[in-house]
Structure formats: structure tokens, C-alpha cells
A protein has these predicted regions:
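ATP-dependent adenylation/nucleotidyltransferase module used to activate substrates
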Residues: 1-101, 110-123
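ATP/NTP-dependent adenylation/nucleotidyl-transfer catalytic domains that generate, transfer
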Residues: 88-190
Length: 190
């Protein structure tokens, strides 16, 4: 995947910032061995930390990620199955900046993985199609598969579910979190 990104940035003369997790003392294979379970959650937290740190150090006002509709629906389903009100209160295509945290946006939230892959193919953009080598047994893969099957039988259901959550569910969870939730703040050691 890294090679694909490097070639894309070189072709279009985009600057590329690479953070090597092993050099930071957090090599993902080592973290995986210590966890002895699917690493997705820990890997995501590690990446979010370094994305945010890089944005702040670089003076970037917004951090954009490539999360798409499939990612968002799988995450929403996972958070709903656990009734994780903290995550449900801030899930969405945009998260404002706050004390020590860069503003985050997900410009592809309306687009599926399939649509993105088709666009890349039609435009001649090299794409990396292989799943993460550590994702075996991860719940997100299972949830994405379930949503693909549901979408096949009920077209438009992914967007209906996610958009409905943004309009009705998220405000309810935000209200509940404001009343009883913890305030997100930067780590005092970091």
C-alpha cells in the first residue's frame, strides 16, 4: 500500500509525510503479538494519535481520512451493538477541532468501497486492493460482509441507515453524552 501512495504522490508532485511505527517504538506486528486478539482497535488508536500529532506539528487545520460509507456503516453497527454512547455521540463525517485535537473530515463518507475502486479503475489510478494482513477475525470485516449482503437485497439501505443516524441518532447520543459523558482531553504524558 505504501508504494502505491508513494507513486501517486510522486506522479502528482504531492508532498508525503511518512511516520514509521517501528521507529516510533510501536511496530504493529509487535503490538499484535502482545495483544493476542484482532489488532484493529489498537492499531486505529495508534494511527489516530500519530495522524493528530502530525497535523498539529505541520500546522494543518484539517485532517482528512479516506473512510467511506462501508467503513462508516460498519463502525456505526459495531458501536451500536456495544451501545457505546461516547463513540456514537461523535461519529460522523466531521469532528470539530478541540483542545489538542485537529479537526477531522471524511470526504468519502457518501461513497462505497466499490464505487471508489471503480472510479480508480476508470481513471487509471493505481489502487491497493489487498485487505490488511492483520484483519483476520476482525469484526469490521464481518460487519462489512453483512452490510454488502443486506445492500444487495435492499439497495440504498446503507445510506438510509447512516443518514438516519446522522439526522436522528447522533443528536440523541450527543445530548446524553453532554449530560453524563467524560470530556475528551489530550493525554498528559503525550
Amino acid at each position: 500500500a505504501r508504494g502505491v501512495v508513494e507513486r501517486f504522490c510522486q506522479k502528482y508532485d504531492f508532498p508525503l509525510i511518512v511516520r514509521d511505527m517501528a521507529a516510533e517504538g510501536l511496530a504493529i506486528p509487535d503490538v499484535k503479538r502482545k495483544l493476542k486478539r484482532p489488532i484493529c482497535s489498537a492499531c486505529g488508536k495508534i494511527k489516530r494519535y500519530f495522524f493528530n500529532q502530525t497535523a498539529k506539528e505541520g500546522g494543518f487545520t484539517v485532517l482528512a481520512t479516506g473512510h467511506n460509507l462501508d467503513d462508516e456503516v460498519a463502525r456505526l453497527t459495531s458501536n451500536t451493538l456495544r451501545w457505546d454512547s461516547a463513540y456514537l455521540s461523535d461519529q460522523g463525517p466531521m469532528l470539530d477541532d478541540s483542545d489538542g485535537f485537529a479537526k477531522k473530515v471524511k470526504p468519502f463518507w457518501r461513497v462505497t468501497e466499490f464505487e471508489t475502486a471503480n472510479y480508480a479503475f476508470l481513471m487509471g489510478i493505481e489502487n491497493h486492493y489487498a485487505p490488511c494482513p492483520y484483519s483476520t477475525g476482525a469484526s469490521f470485516s464481518t460487519l462489512k460482509s453483512l452490510w454488502l449482503e443486506l445492500e444487495d437485497k435492499m439497495p440504498g439501505r446503507k445510506m438510509d441507515f447512516y443518514h438516519g443516524f446522522l439526522e436522528r441518532g447522533k443528536p440523541a447520543f450527543q445530548s446524553a453524552e453532554q449530560q453524563e459523558g467524560d470530556v475528551l482531553s489530550p493525554c498528559t504524558r503525550c
